[in-house]
A protein has these predicted regions:
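Thiamine diphosphate
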Residues: 1-63, 80-83, 87-179, 182-232, 491-507, ...
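Active-site cofactor/cluster-binding pocket
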Residues: 1-2, 7, 11, 15, ...
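General beta-strand structural signal in soluble alpha/beta enzymes
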Residues: 31-33, 64-66, 122-126, 162-163, ...
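Active-site-adjacent bridging/hinge elements
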Residues: 85, 206-215, 255, 463-477
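Ferredoxin-type iron-sulfur electron-transfer modules and their immediate structural context
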Residues: 251, 264-417, 425-507, 512-635, ...
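A structural-propensity feature for long, helix-poor, extended segments
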Residues: 2-4, 125-164, 268, 278, ...
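Short acidic, glycine/serine/threonine-rich loops at helix termini
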Residues: 6-12, 42-47, 105-109, 134-138, ...
């Protein structure tokens, strides 16, 4: 069976077979059941053999598992050496790419070209990690004259192409490559740089297996023709040149024809750029004449992780290296929880360009850090004595603002965590840009040293400015960092800023969707903690029940805090409770619904709690056990428009109608982003999306106006690119409102086909508001109590050109 039925006597197929023999009567053979392939596990010939070996045993193991190492319940079968059943003469090719570079799409084109224009059989499998654009992808392609029935990934390749240079130290790219095979690396390194940047083990394999080794600077070619980071056609041309599956001239002609079919709807400009990339690819391909000494060298790039905590070393690193399938069951957490802040260990290094800060023109507005989707650029405020021993490249300027008088300021990039989207540079308001995107190799060394110094020597100055001001919010540590979201993502900036405002006391129920995938994909979590160990608690149930899930969490916290208040009341009535403890207990009871006061009084209670022990009060232990509830929790439900407008609307409506104090943030991309861009009720009239390829024929559901009809729900419509201060006001008011709050955030998305690129997502949001496409407003029931109109329209009368805005997005322009 390829399923697990918890609580059953056996899996479905096993039970069906047992039942069939039992009902037939007569002779019944020994029936053995087991499980394979769970969690996308590969099912290889060696595993099949292990099943037969088990059946040949004197006492075959029943209810076995194959493909995992179960050292907890000991159900697994021992697997022997791997072997291949691929027909002789089959060519196996492996392509390692990065999400959104076009590698997977190009390989699908290649399979189609070869399958349609040769007598070869073709097969393709594609493996991805759970990150969005910028994540790891592996394409497994096989071609041969015999039918290919190998339903498993390639274990021994003739051709390996690595489309991202950073991968050479992150993955074992050449594992299983055949003697005399071909290896193609996308990089701009000459032989000297290859000596320095390739690990010794990779050089050993190249030389010992006599590989044909080629390099190509595909990024340079793609940028020269205007494709940016889309290197797929360059690398595909190199593949057809080297693999010799089809005569090269014929392959080029077929590739160009495929380009016209694939990109024709996006206009002649895109088609011509891709054709130019094909034409320039071969001249950029260079064979490397490597020395024979590589076979035994011990010198090369080394990445050390000596100081990693156990969970990182034993679970995270193997999974990140694509070796998670080798982990035993005992390595996993029994309850499904995982530590926070683990994305900081990834250091993916996938950016092509990094922002370079110009201190001479910087006005210290911090808008660049405010909009960063990955919290990979931050302000640093330092006391002069904290700068002793700083690297020469660690340039600072006098900090502006009376609160920062006498201090120094700089903008610091996290070079290995940045995705290079350019959002920070594009929103810079300086007349002469204070951030300019520069090639990775010109920035990496200095910025790594600068970051290491800042983290080791300079404290976070979170108490100096009002956290609800734009600049003040950016002096708070972001408690969402380095997520797996797309470069330029429109969703994560909202959540990141939210964690800077309330993160140390947030509890989040997340609907399944983009925000749950970039929010907590095993094995790493981008939600982190501050220096005191406080940060968001995060959980995900299902797609459809996030509102109910969050409502249940909120109700549980409410009930438990009521119990704590009861204990505090009883403690106050206890003889002998006086002085600082009594003041602290009474102060907390009077201010338990005030976030800052409840935290402060709670700390005072804990500091004096031993007084209860001294007077033999039995309440001390009970209060201590509930200490995490002293600070008022900020309960949030996160989800996309697919959840809020469609799948989970019934639950959302129930929660909003309840009148309870809970906050909802809807990240509105106007499509089901996580599953590839299907139309939702948030998709506007005329927008092209999956299931609406001729343009959606109905209008957008007005979720905000529907919620306002209750009269007691706080509702806000926000757009970070258009008005950052309005975003802060809405977040502050919604969290402070003693009742249900709904915030609908416009989130530009890669599925919208923004023609300027995702680095201009903030500009796109601004254009949407200026054109009247998206409105900014706040509906605050508290104003009605004062006799005022609760509705405030924050966006101005449209001044932009709606047609110009629509023409800038493929979802409309293609229509």
């Amino acid at each position: 069976d390829r399923t697990k039925e918890p609580g059953s006597l056996g899996e479905p197929l096993y039970q069906d077979v047992c039942t069939a023999f039992q009902e037939k009567g007569g002779y019944t053979p020994n029936i053995v059941g087991g499980r394979y392939g769970l969690g996308s596990k590969d099912f290889t010939p060696a595993m099949v053999k292990a099943v037969y070996d088990n059946l040949l045993g004197m006492q075959p193991k029943n209810h076995f598992t194959v493909g995992i190492e179960d050292d907890v319940t000991n159900t697994s079968l021992e697997i022997g050496p791997s072997f291949s059943t691929v027909p002789e003469g089959t060519i196996s090719c492996l392509f390692y790419g990065i999400g959104s570079d076009g590698t997977v799409g190009a390989n699908k084109q290649a399979i189609k070209i070869i399958g349609d224009n040769t007598d070869l059989y073709a097969q393709a499998y594609f493996a991805y990690d759970s990150k969005k654009s910028g994540g790891f992808t592996a394409s497994h392609l096989r071609f041969g004259k015999s039918p290919i029935k190998s339903c498993y990934l390639i274990q021994s390749a003739d051709y390996v192409a690595c489309h991202k240079a950073a991968y050479v130290t992150q993955y074992d790219l050449l594992r299983g490559i055949k003697d005399g095979g071909t290896f193609v690396l996308n990089c701009n390194w000459d032989l000297k740089a290859l000596e320095e940047n390739l690990p010794a083990s990779m050089k050993n394999t190249i030389a010992r297996k006599h590989l044909k080794f080629f390099t190509i600077d595909a990024v340079d070619v793609a940028q020269n023709v205007g494709l940016g980071g889309r290197i797929n056609m360059v690398m595909q041309t190199a593949f057809f040149k080297l693999a010799d599956v089809i005569p090269f001239d014929k392959a080029v002609a077929l590739l160009k024809e495929s380009i016209k079919k694939t990109y024709g709807s996006k206009g002649d400009k895109i088609v011509n750029m891709n054709i130019a990339a094909v034409d320039q690819a071969v001249s950029a391909l260079h064979e490397v004449s490597y020395p024979a000494s590589w076979a035994d060298t011990t010198e090369g790039a080394v990445v050390r992780h000596d100081s990693d905590p156990d969970y990182i070393a034993n679970v995270v690193r193997p999974i990140l290296a694509q070796n998670g399938g080798d982990l035993p069951v005992s390595a996993m957490s029994p309850d499904g929880t995982m530590p926070n802040g683990t994305t900081s260990f990834e250091k993916r290094g996938v950016a092509i360009m990094l922002p370079e800060w110009n201190p001479e023109t910087c006005v210290q507005c911090c808008q660049c850090t405010f909009v960063c989707p990955h919290a990979a650029i931050r302000p640093v405020v330092a006391q002069p004595d904290e700068l002793e021993g700083a690297p020469e490249s660690f340039v600072t300027i006098d900090a502006k603002g009376k609160e920062l008088k006498g201090m120094k300021f700089r903008i610091q990039v996290y070079p290995e965590d940045c995705l290079g989207c350019g959002s920070c540079a594009n929103v810079c308001i300086s007349k002469e840009k204070s951030l300019v995107m520069k090639p990775l190799e010109t920035q990496m060394a200095d910025q790594k040293a600068n970051l290491a110094f800042a983290e080791a020597n300079i404290s976070v100055k979170s108490q100096l400015m009002d956290r609800f001001s734009l600049k003040g919010s950016q002096l708070q540590q972001p408690l969402l960092e380095f997520s797996g979201a797309c470069a330029g993502c429109g969703e994560t900036p909202y959540v990141k800023v939210l964690t800077q405002l309330f993160g140390e006391r947030m509890v989040v129920a997340n609907a399944t969707g983009c925000s749950s995938i970039w929010g907590a994909s095993s094995p790493t979590s981008p939600y982190t903690v501050n220096e005191d160990g406080f940060g968001p608690s995060w959980g995900n149930s299902l797609f459809e029940d996030a509102a109910e899930y969050g409502f249940g969490i909120m109700s549980g916290i409410k009930q438990r805090r009521a119990k704590l208040a009861d204990l505090v009341t009883k403690a106050l009535a206890t003889e002998g409770v006086e002085g600082e403890l009594k003041d602290a207990l009474q102060g907390w009871l009077d201010n338990k619904d005030d976030a800052e006061a409840s935290r402060s009084y709670g700390e005072k209670v804990m500091a004096n709690l031993e007084t209860l022990d001294e007077i033999d009060c039995p309440l001390a232990d009970q209060i201590y056990d509930m200490a995490d509830l002293f600070t008022k929790k900020s309960c949030w439900i996160f989800g996309g428009d697919g959840w809020a407008y469609d799948i989970g609307y019934g639950g959302l409506d129930h929660v909003l109608a309840s009148g309870e104090d809970i906050n909802v943030l809807v990240l509105d991309t106007e499509v089901y982003s996580n599953t590839g861009g299907q139309a939702s009720k948030a998709t506007p009239l005329g927008a092209i999306a999956q299931f609406a390829m001729a343009g959606k024929r109905t209008g957008k559901k007005d979720l905000g106006r529907m919620a306002m009809t209750y009269g007691y729900v706080y509702v806000a419509s926000i757009c970070m690119g258009a008005d950052k201060n309005q975003v802060l006001k809405a977040f502050k008011e919604a969290e402070a409102y003693k009742g249900p709050s709904l915030i609908i955030a416009y989130a530009p998305c890669i599925n919208q086909g923004i023609r300027k690129g995702m680095g201009k997502s903030m500009e796109e949001g601004k254009l949407a508001v200026q054109a009247g496409y998206w409105m900014l407003y706040r509906f605050n029931p508290e104003l009605a109590k004062e006799g005022k109109n609760p509705f405030q329209l924050d966006s101005k009368e449209p001044t932009g050109d709606l047609n110009e805005f629509l023409s800038g997005e493929n979802r409309y322009a293609s229509l």
